[in-house]
């Protein structure tokens, strides 16, 4: 931790300004200067983690290799940095409070009255310092907006850290909005000025202003922001909208963000090597080919519920010089006659609950019968089994016990027991608590030779991430296999991890979530081959 330098990223004016992408972009530039870099996300909500939140409330829950259910921004960090992060890279107010109360019960505070300062702020600082071990830079993204009461003690902890570490170890980057008033054709700086005033009132002074704007800022406006916010003129970085989030590091580099960073930290001029990155971004922005993927989901009112999967399709497309167009198909209102017109492949993602499953099953049947390339992920694979049992084996009552515990043919059922990542036996019932009780994180999968899965991964054993309570019932396996639906992947305890359909160009189901390990620089192999198959269809 001694050598680590800290870049704190806060947000002002309103939420969803792109602090996560901004943090990822800064980290990417520093990483490409051969520094050891990581990112930490602080979430101010009181939930322990987002695991039980509705996807429509929070967006995607991203699962790390060590089984943590985290904020979707952790997915951005991994995809930009091309490395695995852990549960140490995300914490919530719920976790902070829980730790402080647990310590109080153990008597670790020696009878003191427990207060926000110093006990809560000390726990925040401890976690930040712990995440910085072995690094040159730790970027810390503070969720929420300056002025929110939920974030007050985080800003206090940042203020204290700057005093403890010194100015030469800390930079505060404030992401803010420069709104454009169309009627007067003006860009307005007043919200930024007020946001910075509020931040400074709380004891945190920004050294860099990252101004989100729909239009470029002229020199006069940048100078105005610099003067009113008390930063150097070259420390006002304009972040206009880009055609791809992966173009943001290039934009920040062109805007000169590394100049104030190097100056503050007493570093020589920074020269990131971005040629390979630039090539991939160019293929995203101006690809040679196109495919259309029918994406059959039910959380379509907030597409960030599927963020990692959307990005994984983009990664595969970049490596194939292909624009992947998504045809969003609502599984609750699925029209089998018209919804799949013109699609080159069908994707059925993971999900929870009974709502919309019949539409997904209908789409899977179309993919099977019409030999459209198909990829089913988690619930998507489970429903492929249900569809096959109903329509090929004639088991009309086939279902998952997630939807009907008394179904006639429980071809998908609750994982009663399994070995977790620590080789501890876990036992689950239908009455088990929901939070943190799924099969979570990275597990090994043995692949059958001569399968599409082996062709994609090019090795007999892989590790992929999981997030599920239900599994395929092996009782019916022989019946499926006799009809051409083969099991091609096995996990611990012989859990069925992957299936493929014979005499079909590409019909694959996987229990794991391949999207969680896809990165711009290294797309996930099975998703890459899925897009290849769609390309051959188009």
From Swiss-Prot:
One of its GO terms (cellular component) is cytosol. Allosterically activated by GTP, when glutamine is the substrate; GTP has no effect on the reaction when ammonia is the substrate. The allosteric effector GTP functions by stabilizing the protein conformation that binds the tetrahedral intermediate(s) formed during glutamine hydrolysis. Inhibited by the product CTP, via allosteric rather than competitive inhibition. Mg(2+) binds at residues 73, 141. This is CTP synthase. Belongs to the CTP synthase family. CTP binds at residues 15, 148-150, 188-193, 224. It catalyses: UTP + L-glutamine + ATP + H2O = CTP + L-glutamate + ADP + phosphate + 2 H(+); L-glutamine + H2O = L-glutamate + NH4(+); UTP + NH4(+) + ATP = CTP + ADP + phosphate + 2 H(+). L-glutamine binds at residues 351, 379-382, 402, 469. The gene is pyrG. One of its GO terms (biological process) is pyrimidine nucleobase biosynthetic process. Homotetramer. PANTHER family: CTP SYNTHASE (PTHR11550), CTP SYNTHASE-RELATED (PTHR11550:SF0).
């Amino acid at each position: 931790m001694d050598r680590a330098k800290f870049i704190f990223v806060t947000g002002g004016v309103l939420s969803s300004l792109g602090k996560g992408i901004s943090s990822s972009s800064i980290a990417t530039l520093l990483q490409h200067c051969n520094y050891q870099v990581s990112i930490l996300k602080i979430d101010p909500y009181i939930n322990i983690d987002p695991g039980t939140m509705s996807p429509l409330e929070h967006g995607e829950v991203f699962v790390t290799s060590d089984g943590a259910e985290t904020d979707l921004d952790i997915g951005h960090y991994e995809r930009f940095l091309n490395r695995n992060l852990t549960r140490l890279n995300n914490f919530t107010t719920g976790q902070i409070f829980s730790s402080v109360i647990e310590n109080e019960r153990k008597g670790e505070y020696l009878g003191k009255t427990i207060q926000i300062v110093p006990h809560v702020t000390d726990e925040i600082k401890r976690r930040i310092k712990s995440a910085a071990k072995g690094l040159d830079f730790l970027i810390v993204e503070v969720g929420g907006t300056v002025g929110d009461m939920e974030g007050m003690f985080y800003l206090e902890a940042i203020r204290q850290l700057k005093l403890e570490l010194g100015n030469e170890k800390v930079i505060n980057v404030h992401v803010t909005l420069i709104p454009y008033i169309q009627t007067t054709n003006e860009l307005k700086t007043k919200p930024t000025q007020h946001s910075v005033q509020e931040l400074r009132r709380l004891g945190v002074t920004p050294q860099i202003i990252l101004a989100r704007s729909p239009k470029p800022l002229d020199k006069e406006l940048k100078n105005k922001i610099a003067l009113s916010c008390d930063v150097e003129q070259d420390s006002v970085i304009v972040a206009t909208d880009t055609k791809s989030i992966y173009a943001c590091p290039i934009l920040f580099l062109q805007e000169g963000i590394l100049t104030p960073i190097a100056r503050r930290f007493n570093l020589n001029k920074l020269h990131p090597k971005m040629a390979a990155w630039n090539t991939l971004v160019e293929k995203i922005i101006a690809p040679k080919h196109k495919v259309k993927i029918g994406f059959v989901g039910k959380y379509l009112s907030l597409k960030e519920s599927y963020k990692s999967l959307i990005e994984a399709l983009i990664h595969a497309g970049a490596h194939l010089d292909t624009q992947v167009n998504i045809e969003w198909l609502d599984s609750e209102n699925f029209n089998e006659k018209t919804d799949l017109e013109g699609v080159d492949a069908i994707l059925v993602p993971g999900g929870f609950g009974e709502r919309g499953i019949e539409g997904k099953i209908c789409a899977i049947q179309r993919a099977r019968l019409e030999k459209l390339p198909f990829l089913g992920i988690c619930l998507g694979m489970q429903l492929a089994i249900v569809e096959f049992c109903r329509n090929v084996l004639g088991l009309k009552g086939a279902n998952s016990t997630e939807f009907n515990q008394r179904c006639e043919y429980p071809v998908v059922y609750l994982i009663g027991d399994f070995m977790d990542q620590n080789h501890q036996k876990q036992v689950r019932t239908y009455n088990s608590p929901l939070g943190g009780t799924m099969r979570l994180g990275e597990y090994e999968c043995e692949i059958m030779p001569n399968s599409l899965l082996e062709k994609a991964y090019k090795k007999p054993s892989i590790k992929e991430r999981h997030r599920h309570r239900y599994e395929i019932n092996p009782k019916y396996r022989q019946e499926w296999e006799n009809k051409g639906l083969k099991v091609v992947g096995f996990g611990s305890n012989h859990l069925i991890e992957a299936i493929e359909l014979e005499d079909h160009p590409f019909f694959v189901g996987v229990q794991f979530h391949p999207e969680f390990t896809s990165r711009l620089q290294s797309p996930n192999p099975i998703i890459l081959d899925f897009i290849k198959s769609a390309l051959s269809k188009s």
